Each structure stands twice: as C-alpha cells, then as structure tokens.
C-alpha cells in the first residue's frame, strides 16, 4: 500500500506581545493551554485508518506577524491540515490569526476574568469574518480561575467535534475517487461530477473503464497466493442461502465455484486499483502496483458488466467491511452502481467515525396501518410511527449485522481498531450468500443477506447535487428496529429476500420533513442512502460547513449545531444562515 503522510493538527498559542511584565507573566499559562489541547486530541482521537493523531505546537507563543510566519513555516513543513489557536488573554487580532484560506481553523478563548481571552476571541473572529476566512469559535460557558488547567466539558466537545471534521477535510484533500465504469442505469449519482470533487472536496476523479478490471483478472495481474487464501477463507466462513432462480438459471457446483472465484478476484483487483499493491511489482507489473491514490471508489456494474460477468455484490460487501481473509482491517469505501454522491456520504461517515458504512436503497416506507393490514402485527416502541426498509443487493458492509458489541454488551458497529476476530467471525456467521437473481444479474454473483439487530442508533445521510445551487447534505438520525421474525419474513419476501435488510425508524420532530416517517421518505433526495453508526449528525453538520455544503434536512438538536462564527451574520434562522454562508463563501477549494 502506498503510504502518504497523515495530516496533523496545528496548535497555535497566541499571546499579548507587550514585554516588561505582560508577556512574561502569560508565557507558561498560554503554552500549557496549547499542551493541554494537544494532549486531549491525541488521547481522544484517531485517524480513520486507526493511526494516532499527532499535534504540532508552535515553537513559541505568537504575538505578531513574525512569530505567526515562523509558526506557519513549521506547519507547512509538517503537513498540518487544520489549526486550533488558543489563548487566555488579549492578543493582537488580525496580526496573529491563521490566514490559510482552505485550512479549517478554530480559536479557543479562555473564559477567565484576569485576562480577556474572550475579547481576543471576538476580535480575531471579526478579522476572520472581514477577510472572508471563516473560523470556529470555542468559548467555555462558565468562568474559570486563571490557574485552572482543566478543559471544561463544553469546550472539550467543541474541540473534538472541530478536530474530527477538520481531520476529515484534510484527509480527503489530494486524494482521488476511482470511478470504475460510468453511469449505471441512469442513476444521477453515477454521473460523476469532477467539479464537485475538485471544488468542494479538494479531490480528483480517476475514471477507469471496467475493461481494466477484466484485463487484470484475465491477465492475472494480482497476487495468486492471496487468491488461494481468499478462497480458503470463503470456504471456511461463507454460508450459502437458497437459490431462488428458476431451474434453468441455476448453476452447478463448478459454475458456482467460478463465480465465487471471480467475485473474490474483483475485490482484490478493485482494492489494488484503489491503494496499490507492492506484490504486483514483484511480478513485473510496476505501473499497476501504484494504484490510483483512491480514498473512495464506485463500481458501475449494471448493466454493462453484470449482463455477462458476476456482479459486484460480494466484492463491494467485503471491501466495505472491516475484515476479510487478511483479518480485521480498515474498511474501504466502495459505492455500488458507482453512485459517487452516496460514496461521498460513505467517505464522510468513515472519516468521522473510523467505522464501516452501510450502503442501501431507501426502498419502502411501511406505515403502521399497512404493516398491520399485511401481517396483522401492530408496530410499537421505536417503530410505532412506521419504518423505512433499507435494502440493496450490493455494498452493505457485513458490520451492518451489528454482531459486534460495545462495552455494555449492546449491538453496534465499532471502529476497526476495536473489533476482535471473534466479532468479525460473528458478522460472517450472521450472513448468508445467496445466488444472484438471474433477472437482475445475468452473469451471476452472490448477494449478502443479513438482518441488522434492532435498537441500534444510526445516522442516515446522503449528498445530492442541485443545478444552480450545488451539493447539499441530508441527515436523519434514528434507530434500527427489530420486527418479529414472521413479520420480517412477510415484508421481506414482498421485495427481494436475498438481500441485506435494515428496518429504520428516524427520530421525529413533528416539523417539516421530520413531521412523520412518511415525510422523511418523501423528502429524501435520491434512491440511495448511507447508515453510519451512532447519532453523529452534528459531526456531519460541522464537516459540511467546512466544505461549504449546506444541510437541507436534519433532525439534530439545535444546541449541537456547530458551524463557523461568521454564519451568525448571515441571518437569524440557523438553517437559512447555512445556505447564505455557503453561497457567500463558495466551495472550499474554489475553481
């Protein structure tokens, strides 16, 4: 795998530059504030790959232009991707701020009475607003004593939320989206918009025809020893579901083995195309060994591939999961049907949480009345207002079965660095692999089938592009729901029972698109969505504001909405502010 240095967090202690007593009295307190911030972030955060987060602190406190420039030189040489400026006192506003136009930045002004940290915070934010370089404000709710070195809970929450989102921004910058194929069945998300990736995400698009995948398979441009390992792993761990095809379309054992072999090869080759593989250089394929520096990918599949070759279901499901024949590892981000916009939502979720993402069709709204009519069952609990059936043949991560457990024994999806091999095995054991339905996939394949455990908090997201407006983000926090087995079976067999299912109940607010479950479904902007573990909508909102992507729909509590301070100057309604600010500032990487 090609190694590119991970972005670091820069910590900028700023100080009142007046000597003869003022600066000298503040040096230790200011630098300790920077060190405490760095300690918090390195203890609480990891990169999505699992590596520890590193912080870089300015060599000196920053009182003016010269020290700000020296700090910037250090940060530029150490791949600092976001900055946090900290101070307990008055400093010189525009002389000390971080002026990099694309680097996410926050300022923590200490809430104390001895020195006016809050006054500097306000002055510096005014400079940021006037110069068109938005910054996030961090200011504790309660006054602290000057010698109090603790970080209050509300300050910690903002520091961590800012840092998670800022690391996501910095990690995406300079990477690529691998578009393997073109437009799938007219799905708009697979009309890959290069300008969106370049201007809003700082990414490139690598467009590769699906014949490149065919070439790699046919010419054995892969690690043959690894293929044997993958086959042995599948033989040990795969349970096969019923073949629902008519007799004339069912494959014999030899044909089924060939389909499995090619499905695993597809996973290997797509992975190698994304990140490279030094083993390919060993067999003389140096160019192919480099990969495309892809942090996310999409596979068109339907129909130009799937009408004659095995579909991408197995490859996508395995790649998006946190484990394979090599053990537990970081999940990849691979969007089925090359839905690049759902792929971006997956990428955001993975970068914010380090977890696998569940790709799904937003297939059916089931009202309580309809379920009672069809099954005789009356919905209650989380499901009492109705549920949405999330189901897709393709790339739902097997982690989505929720056979992993948190510290209290509850079902969940964990960051890959916390997953045990036993938990990975449990997810595999909960999954059946069903022969693909011939009417959809003439080339065959295997679709994973599992049922997500109930009562698990999830956040469903989706990015859409609106002509004349640009990208927008949708967010719906809610829970998975467990239905009685007979009820699930009746409902599931009305669609395609060979695919993975999550029954989802969004949290309702009684207003707008969250008036009821029907309205959530009716306002969803496309046929696909992504499930990310936990109620993490607030993190998505912060990330979107950094990228200048307005949020058109969410059910996050207003007190958790955290955006740059300049948004407040764009009107009195916080969602209207978001639209006006994103339009005013334009995409983060303007083109």
From Swiss-Prot:
Q: Name one GO biological process term.
A: L-fucose catabolic process
One MF term from GO for this chain?
L-fucose isomerase activity
Cellular component terms per the entry's GO annotation: cytoplasm
Q: Which Pfam families match?
A: Fucose_iso_C, Fucose_iso_N1, Fucose_iso_N2
Pathway it works in: Carbohydrate degradation; L-fucose degradation; L-lactaldehyde and glycerone phosphate from L-fucose: step 1/3
Family annotation (InterPro entries): Fuc/Ara_isomerase_C (IPR004216), Fuc_iso_dom3_sf (IPR038393), Fuc_isomerase_C (IPR015888), Fucose_iso_dom1_sf (IPR038391), Fucose_iso_N1 (IPR012888), Fucose_isomerase (IPR005763), Fucose_isomerase_dom2_sf (IPR038392), Fucose_isomerase_N/cen_sf (IPR009015)
* PANTHER family attached to this UniProt entry: L-FUCOSE ISOMERASE (PTHR37840:SF1)
Role of this protein: Converts the aldose L-fucose into the corresponding ketose L-fuculose.
Stated name of the protein: L-fucose isomerase
Q: Which organism is it from?
A: Escherichia coli O157:H7
